[in-house]
Amino acid sequence: MNGELSERARWAIVVAFAVAMAWVEAACVFYIRALVDRVEPYQVNPLPISAALGTVELWREAATLAMIVTIGLLAGRSWRRRIGYAAIAFGVWDVFYYVFLRVICGWPKTLFDWDILFLLPLPWWAPVLAPVSIALLMILWGTVASQGGEPARAPRWPWALGGVGVVLALAVFMVDASRALPHGREAVLRVLPTTFNWPLFSVSLLLMAFPALAEARRAAELTAGVRSRHTAENSGRWSPP
């Protein structure tokens, strides 16, 4: 990307890329689910995938993540902004993935429909609302991080809390598959969760929100400081002798 592009232009380009990528992702997932007669994933034997097709699907997921990281690296001019743009790309991609699936096949019908989010390292199960909530947080944090100034020194405690939140969310997503793991691969593929731990997920979401909230607060303070300096400079420049 050209160094002359403003951060707003870079943000718009990343969003456009993520939206287009979401359509490709939704189309691919629709093809696969139609092929195995699982357009709606929450049904008996939810992952009737052959070994060959399963391997291809795992590599497709890995390639998707590589594309998201790549657009972040290309868009950002510092590591902070690169991570921010990657977060924006992931969040926008995830939200529009569900929007386009709804357009293509009428699923999900509600935000509480169950979905298989990822297969790495185990199947992740959750209602659609859960990944969408995380995606919106990523868009918020990524936008503030990519559009704001570079901090002299950012506190680490919000990231520590956010990391704990990520671990908790992963545990909630993979708890059913992990319980079936001792019974072998077939048992893991046939898992069909019946309940979702919303209280624990809510705690994890709150913890994951700390980096975004801390970043937003820092950006607001930085903006207020810049305005104060400009006001002081203008007052000194135009004050009578």
Language-model features: where?
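Interfacial segments of alpha-helical transmembrane regions
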Residues: 6-18, 76-92, 152-164
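Alpha-helical transmembrane segments of multi-pass membrane proteins
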Residues: 18-35, 172-176
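Interfacial helix-loop-helix junctions of multi-pass membrane proteins
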Residues: 31-38, 99-118, 179-189
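Perimembrane loop-to-helix junctions flanking transmembrane segments
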Residues: 36-53
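Membrane-interface loop-to-helix entry segments
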Residues: 48-70, 119-140, 195-201
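Structural signal for the C-terminal ends of transmembrane alpha-helices
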Residues: 71-79, 140-150, 210-218
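Small-residue hotspots
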Residues: 84, 91, 135, 142, ...
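Membrane-proximal helix-loop-helix units in multi-pass membrane proteins
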Residues: 95-153
